[in-house]
A protein has these predicted regions:
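Acidic, glycine-rich A-domain
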Residues: 133-403
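Extended non-core architectural segments that shape protein topology and connectivity
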Residues: 1-164, 168, 178-179, 380-383, ...
Length: 403
């Protein structure tokens, strides 16, 4: 039951990272997890079976307009006009990412989650899109159920991280004495009440919390994160809630790459409040072109209302995409994977740092990939082994950067 069509694609294992094991000429591959005796016990390989209801969509060499229709039907319409989209791609989709595309979306509205646009007339594609939407809805329930089941742990993490951030912010607060209608009486001002009918004869100490920075959260939403979806959504919730509690502007989005498009799903913008539940819509699919996602994040951070910017990136340090690197003799006919992709991601992290943006990696993965994470993020890396470590580890790195 494997659908076939001509094209060049990667067949991959789902583990802590993607590992290429060959090329096949298929359009659609449904992936059924099974355990491989030759792999570590905590990793899963893939069989090419039609029975499982989630999809690994490999890139297809076809009309980019059709690809856009497909990706939009899966993830939601673009936030930008066609003209704005073209301008951004001319700016961002260059070098290693030439011939790639971007989709910035806020997702699909609830009333359209189980519908498919009429312009998708291919019956096979319609079935695949509908199956993906059903999986997305199921994953929302799983994410929320996981958070509620571990509510005590996550609420405790929010409390600890909020307290840690507030302690740091207090050292940067501006304190001044202001005239007020209540507070401690100031004898020198009493005459104003008697002769000028001015009741502001008291003195009150105002502490103005002025966090001069914003935080963006970028989440890897590729298929290699399927086993971590609930934890990623919950950790992003904890981080977002803690920052918001301290009056720090937060923007949150995920990324994955399908059919030549890197999809940036915007869950929360800087001026959105009380929308953390949107994070439970986090779902993993496709590949991850980390370098292009970082460029897209840089674009989104231009809207920050603060002079200093921080970017948290939830990553497994294993960038991979079936769209080849676009330019340069060294990269010609080379897939975006392994050393090439890691180096590209490292370069993009460094580019952001050179522009004054602090990039912090949040990593949960294998020891091998931990070395790659260190290579990409340097000292600004949070390695998480359990849920209970998250708040303290993130708080520690934040305080180091902001001190």
């Amino acid at each position: 039951d494997v659908y076939k069509r001509q094209g060049i694609y990667f067949l991959q294992k789902v583990a802590g990272a993607f590992h290429s094991i060959g090329k096949v000429s298929t359009q659609y591959v449904r992936a059924n997890s099974f355990y491989d005796k030759n792999m570590a016990s905590d990793t899963a390989a893939l069989s090419m079976e039609h029975s499982k209801r989630y999809l690994l969509q490999f890139a297809l060499q076809k009309d980019p307009i059709e690809a856009k229709r497909y990706v939009t039907a899966c993830f939601g319409k673009s936030m930008y006009s066609d003209r704005q989209q073209d301008e951004m791609e001319k700016k961002l989709c260059v070098g290693n990412h030439k011939n790639c595309h971007l989709l910035f979306t806020r997702g699909i509205s609830s009333e359209k989650k189980q519908t498919i646009p009429d312009e998708i007339d291919n019956k096979r594609e319609r079935r695949e899109i509908l199956a993906f939407k059903k999986e997305t809805a199921m994953q929302y329930d799983k994410n929320k159920e996981h958070f509620e089941k571990n509510m005590a742990v996550y609420q405790n993490s929010i409390r600890r991280l909020t307290e840690s951030l507030r302690m740091h912010l207090e050292t940067a607060d501006e304190t001044f004495m202001d005239a007020s209608t209540h507070g401690r009486i100031k004898p020198a001002r009493v005459w104003k009440a008697l002769y000028l009918d001015n009741p502001r004869v008291f003195e009150r100490k105002d502490e103005v919390e002025t966090p001069g920075f914003s935080v963006d959260i970028l989440m890897d939403a590729s298929s290699s994160r399927k086993q971590m979806q609930q934890k990623i959504a919950a950790q992003a919730y904890v981080l977002s809630k803690s920052l918001t509690n301290c009056g720090i502007p937060v923007q949150i989005y995920s990324y994955c790459s399908i059919r030549g498009y890197t999809v940036m799903h915007i869950f929360k913008e800087y001026d959105d409040y009380g929308v953390e539940d949107e994070l439970f819509h986090f779902v993993a699919a496709g590949n991850n072109r980390d370098g292009l996602a970082l460029r897209a994040a840089s674009h989104l951070m231009e809207l920050s209302p603060k002079p200093k910017k921080l970017l948290f990136m939830f990553s497994d340090a294993s960038p991979q995409d079936d769209q080849i690197a676009g330019e340069g003799a060294f990269y010609k006919d080379r897939e975006y994977t392994d050393a090439l992709a890691v180096k590209d991601t490292e370069n993009e992290v460094q580019r952001l740092k050179n522009h004054g943006i602090d990039v912090i990696g949040i990593f949960m993965g294998s020891a091998h990939d931990s070395e790659l994470a260190t290579k990409i993020f340097g000292r600004s890396l949070v390695k998480i082994k359990s849920i209970n470590e998250f708040a303290d580890a993130v708080g520690r790195v934040l305080n180091e950067i902001l001190t």
